[in-house]
């Protein structure tokens, strides 16, 4: 082979090798940048930091509120389990949609959770500290969120959970959709002068419950009704005695419809309240203004809390 031709072949081979090395180097840099972009760190409500190399793919939700938020944040393929309440139509707004996820967990059972090999566990701050710690002791990624007590808390919770699962933009979209829904509901209700706003008391099976920090207070404000229990000024939350409720003399009694144990039939609870001798002198009972609204809305601390505003306004002003 002539020397000149041999040199041309060598030069061509070296050029090809150089191109391959450049391409490989670019691919490596691209992969490193991609991995760097995918990695992120979040801090939960207790100040605990969680580091993720990539978005979690086996997420476990241990409460109905995070069940409802999570299903709108990520595809079902990234959810390993929901809470057991997700299948109860009395308290869950996503019963049918939740069927796309096969497993259910009890937030108190560390072993059952561990068996599902989760890469992220969402758990409320009211769970016992020892349960949370037992999960962390298993080297599991546990994100403890603050239980919402207002509409702003719900917005914040959605945003924080969005960050935790690596879907910050999706979380913002959910908050925007929630606020747009709330505006439509408020536009439907219209403006009701304060002096014409109905005074109500929300009753449980064991009586009225006083709580100065409860999401229901915000529901009332947006529905333009007055929660008569806010006129009380107790030192701590608790059951309000019958005499105090009678003194408040509400115009409406409100009940949450959820027969969670087969012994709390909503219609029967209405009748029991209307026939309770202790409340016969209240305007609510005298005028038979005892209404039941869906518990899955009025007890919600997810985006579905907006539905409670509409339910309450409809019950109080449309009946």
Regions found by a protein language model. Name each.
Residues 61-116, 120-125, 228:
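A short, structured surface patch at a secondary-structure boundary
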Residues 86-88, 209-237:
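Alpha-helical, coiled-coil/dimerization segments enriched in small aliphatic residues
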Residues 53-56, 63, 67-68, 95, ...:
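Extracytoplasmic/secreted envelope proteins and their assembly/folding machinery
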Residues 63, 125-126, 147, 252, ...:
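Short secondary-structure boundary segments
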Residues 109-123, 140, 241-258:
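Proline-aspartate-enriched helix->loop->beta-strand connector
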Residues 45-47, 99-111, 233-242:
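Short helix-initiation/N-cap motifs at beta->coil->alpha
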Residues 39, 130-204, 208, 229-230, ...:
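Extracytoplasmic substrate-binding proteins
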Residues 2-11, 15, 24-67, 169-201, ...:
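Bacterial Sec-exported substrate-binding components of ABC uptake systems
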């Amino acid at each position: 082979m002539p020397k000149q031709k041999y040199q041309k072949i060598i030069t061509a081979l070296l050029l090809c090798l150089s191109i391959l090395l450049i391409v490989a180097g670019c691919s490596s840099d691209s992969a490193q940048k991609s991995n760097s972009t995918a990695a992120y760190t979040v801090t939960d409500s207790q100040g605990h930091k969680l580091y993720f190399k990539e978005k979690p793919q086996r997420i476990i939700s241990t409460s109905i509120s995070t069940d409802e938020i999570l299903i709108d944040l990520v595809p079902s393929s990234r959810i390993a389990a929901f809470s057991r309440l997700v299948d109860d139509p009395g308290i869950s707004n996503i019963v049918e949609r939740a069927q796309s996820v096969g497993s259910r967990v009890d937030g108190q059972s560390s072993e059952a959770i561990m068996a599902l090999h989760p890469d992220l566990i969402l758990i409320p701050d009211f769970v016992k500290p020892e349960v949370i710690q037992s999960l962390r002791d298993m080297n599991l990624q546990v994100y403890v969120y603050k239980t919402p007590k207002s509409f702003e808390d719900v917005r914040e919770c959605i945003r924080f959970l969005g960050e935790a699962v690596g879907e910050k933009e999706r979380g913002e979209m959910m908050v925007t959709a929630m606020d747009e829904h709330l505006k439509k509901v408020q536009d439907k209700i219209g403006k009701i002068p304060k002096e014409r706003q109905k005074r109500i008391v929300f009753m449980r099976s064991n009586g009225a419950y006083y709580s100065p920090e409860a999401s229901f207070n915000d529901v009332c404000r947006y529905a333009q009704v007055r929660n008569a229990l806010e006129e009380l000024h107790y030192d701590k939350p608790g059951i309000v005695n019958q005499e105090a409720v009678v003194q408040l003399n509400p115009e409406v009694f409100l009940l949450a419809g959820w027969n969670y144990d087969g012994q709390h039939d909503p219609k029967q609870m209405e009748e029991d309240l209307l026939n309770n001798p202790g409340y016969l002198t209240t305007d609510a009972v005298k005028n038979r203004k005892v209404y039941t609204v869906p518990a899955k809305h009025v007890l919600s601390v997810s985006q579905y809390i907006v539905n409670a505003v509409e339910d309450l306004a409809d019950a109080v002003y449309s009946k």
